Amino acid sequence: MKKMKLAAIFAGLVSVFTFSSCLNDGDSGPNYDLYEIVTVEDGSIFGGPILKGDAWGYTYTPVASSVLAGLKASDGSYYKRVQVGIKLMEGEAITEGKKSYKVSEVGLIAILNYKDFNVQADTLKNEYALVSLEDSNNKIWAINGYVNVPFTFKTKEQLNMNDFHLYAVEAKEDTLVTRLRQTKGADDAYQTGGALISFHMPFNDMEFYETFNKVVPKSDTIVVKVTAKGENDKELVSTVKCSASNMRGSY
């Protein structure tokens, strides 16, 4: 029940809040053991890519490189953020306290939008009002170096994820304050759209690194605060708690 409920939640979230998705063709395919939104990360020098899950903090290691063949883009690189179905290697079983599993099959369900935090916020020239940040069914979450933001916007033309930017503003005690900014639009826009973007924390950028280092965790927990311009001069604010070491750990 837990597995199917989570799959339904994630599937609904991806279908509603992504600009584009990629679904498997053909029959229903393998009977997967679980479904996850995952980050595809490079493994150690002795191994290939691994998957780090959002839901339970599991790490999935493929038994062969071919297992992840379906997660490759046309240029041969791996998509960084995807929703997948996972079949555990024979003999593996989800066990309380165990965080690492070997997997024999991985099926691509959807590709999430992902991009880096903007590190040149002073060059952004426009800011249009968003309708909302998150809603009762789709909340902001942060894990494995990504801040995942569902939001609703207005437009008169087709937009893509490069028309939206998340950047760090300041550190306040245990909180990293960020701002989500829509830079393409129109003040009289009337069409409403929804999106989900996974924003990657750029720890290789010195200014961001220094700002993040000023955040003071409480027992390894920090708060990421996302702000945005709302309609009628309203300030939109959403917050999420996450592990500081987990957010750093992918880099």
What label would you give each PLM region?
Residues 1-44:
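Bacterial Sec-dependent N-terminal signal peptides
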Residues 54-75:
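Beta-strand/loop nucleic-acid-binding surfaces
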Residues 70-100, 225:
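Flexible glycine-rich surface loops and low-complexity tracts that mediate binding to linear polymers
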Residues 75-78, 186-224, 229:
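Short, solvent-exposed, Trp/other aromatic-anchored flexible loops in extracytoplasmic proteins
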Residues 92-154:
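Surface-exposed beta-loop interaction hotspot
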Residues 230-251:
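Short beta-strand elements
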